[in-house]
């Protein structure tokens, strides 16, 4: 990026294009917006490319509750370049290639300093505010001066955005930016669940419920750890061929199992159950099947899917008593600033398959087409280029 552009805009609002969601479920509108300069502990970044995640789809449709606010700028998977920095910003400078990440890592609280969790006790409970340290204060306004709300502290469906340093990761400029964007949410979530949460070991058996991008990323993580059998469960058999690229060895379509439960089929395939199961859909009923599909005494189930209705989970107490374990996984147990550069390094060493996640590439102006592709199940990850 031209250095004169940096100097001419530093400390001033920037006018740029953004895709604004003005009402739940309605088509996004490309409009001119004003992006304020970063405040203390904030960075303004130029988005190079962004991608769609099912979470964007969920919040696009959400028409009730405190986190349903419009107009807003969605988007949270992206890669960008630092355009300017606010006060008290260490570790970032103009021109750095960065990933914005929805999950905070403040580096200072008890949990961030702990090796046991990736939770941030200081910030992670708040999903409602526009800006991390300034509450409902927004850095976005439309051309008429109306405030535009942020989304998950990222808002990447804009040519420029402002992100708190707790949500920002500096990465190597050697990785292609479209591949890098995938690591800011879904792919990292899946790989991290296999590596950090489950700690899959060589020779283990795996069952993955739901073969979207997160489920496929779990398989990629398990493959790299040397899992012997990776079973994919999905009602869409078309995903099975793609799944082989990520290490799946077997597939189950629940609609073709007759009267047998999925857990029964898995136990027959694995002589009593898998070592690890991963629920990547977000259904309480499916979580129970994932739990029962693991081995008695040692089986571990990891929940990655978000149950949007917060339905209660029903598990047999006797199954728990006999040693099965269940746990949740938010952002794959990863501490963003520490672990994402490691994933970048694995890609640069040609060990990590990121290329196969990208099924479509479009110009940013075609963002509504990208939403339609994802909603119809035709897209795994669609890269939206800002300048192509």
Swiss-Prot record:
Cofactors demanded by this protein: Zn(2+)
Residues given in the record as Zn(2+) 1 binding sites: 53, 55, 76, 185
GO CC, one annotated term: nucleus
CDD domains, sorted: alcohol_DH_plants (cd08301)
Keyword Phosphoprotein: no
Residues holding NAD(+): 55, 210-215, 234, 239, 304-306, 331, 381
Subcellular location: Cytoplasm
Entries under Pfam families matching the protein: ADH_N, ADH_zinc_N
InterPro entries referenced in this protein's UniProt entry, alphabetically: ADH-like_C (IPR013149), ADH-like_N (IPR013154), ADH_Zn_CS (IPR002328), GroES-like_sf (IPR011032), NAD(P)-bd_dom_sf (IPR036291)
Family as reported in the entry's similarity comment: Belongs to the zinc-containing alcohol dehydrogenase family. Class-III subfamily.
Assembly: Homodimer.
Name of the protein described by the UniProt record: Alcohol dehydrogenase-like 1
